[in-house]
């Protein structure tokens, strides 16, 4: 079985009391490690609410046994139903199977990520615009 450690943190922009980013790190019952990150575009209460809802929906679906595609489809659908006006958020979903060592990274509207391996930095996915709540049907998850 694979193992490791993870940590995270968030920081408000200067002058703001609330951060619009939310993350969740943990292990699922099926032996996978999950790291979920959402950036509720902007800052303040609305951005924080949107990013928190996205991460909570991801975790609820994964905890219920949904696979990656089902989870992203369900979150996409729930955000479509909840969408009102011009609301944007991004999602990064990293899953590591602690039994096999296989990992996946799915991105919805998120900026590119980087993989450090053997001292080399390689770009991974990204480049799509942020997803608009109520308009996710045209956004597809990029996977790496």
Regions found by a protein language model. Give the residues of each.
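Catalytic core of PPM/PP2C metal-dependent serine/threonine phosphatase domains
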Residues: 1, 48-118
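Short, mixed charged/polar active-site loops
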Residues: 3, 33, 103, 121, ...
């Amino acid at each position: 079985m694979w193992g490791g450690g993870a940590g995270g943190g968030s920081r408000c922009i200067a002058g703001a009391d609330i951060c619009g980013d939310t993350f969740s790190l943990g292990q699922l019952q099926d032996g996978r490690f999950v790291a979920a990150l959402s950036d509720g575009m902007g800052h303040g209460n609305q951005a924080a609410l949107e990013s928190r809802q996205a991460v909570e929906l991801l975790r609820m679906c994964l905890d219920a046994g949904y696979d990656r595609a089902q989870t992203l489809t369900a979150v996409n659908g729930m955000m479509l139903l909840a969408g009102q006006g011009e609301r944007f958020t991004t999602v990064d979903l990293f899953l590591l199977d602690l039994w096999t060592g296989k990992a996946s990274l799915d991105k919805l509207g998120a900026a590119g990520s980087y993989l450090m391996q053997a001292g080399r930095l390689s770009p991974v996915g990204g480049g799509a615009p942020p997803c608009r709540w109520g308009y996710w049907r045209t956004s597809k998850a990029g996977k790496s």
